[in-house]
C-alpha cells in the first residue's frame, strides 16, 4: 500500500468554475498519496452544494474505498464528474469521509 498522508491545508482553498466561487474553505484537508498529485478535500459546509448534482459515476480506490461523483452545474453548462467524495472511506483515510474533492 502506498503511503497516504492527510494534513490540514494551509491558507484558504478556493474552487472556481464559470466565474463563480463554488467552494472556499480554511478547513480543507490535503491528501498526499505516493505517485499522485496532492488533493484537497473540502467540508461540504464550505461548498455551494447547489452547484453539484450527484452523477451515476462510482469509482473504487483500493486504498480509500468507493467514491461517488458529482456534476458541476455552471453557467456555461454542466461539467461532468467534476468532483468526488468518499462517503464511507477505509479506516486509514477516515478523516476525508463526506468531504468533496474537485478535478
What residues fall within each predicted segment?
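Terminal leader/tail segments of proteins
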Residues: 1-103
Amino acid at each position: 500500500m502506498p503511503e497516504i498522508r492527510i494534513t490540514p491545508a494551509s491558507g484558504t482553498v478556493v474552487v472556481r468554475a464559470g466565474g463563480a466561487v463554488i467552494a472556499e474553505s480554511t478547513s480543507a484537508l490535503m491528501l498526499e498519496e505516493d505517485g499522485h498529485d496532492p488533493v484537497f478535500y473540502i467540508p461540504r459546509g464550505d461548498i455551494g452544494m447547489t452547484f453539484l448534482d450527484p452523477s451515476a459515476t462510482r469509482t473504487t480506490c483500493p486504498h480509500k474505498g468507493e467514491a461517488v461523483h458529482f456534476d458541476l452545474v455552471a453557467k456555461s453548462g454542466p461539467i461532468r464528474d467534476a468532483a468526488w467524495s468518499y462517503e464511507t472511506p477505509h479506516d486509514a483515510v477516515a478523516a476525508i469521509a463526506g468531504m468533496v474533492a474537485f478535478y
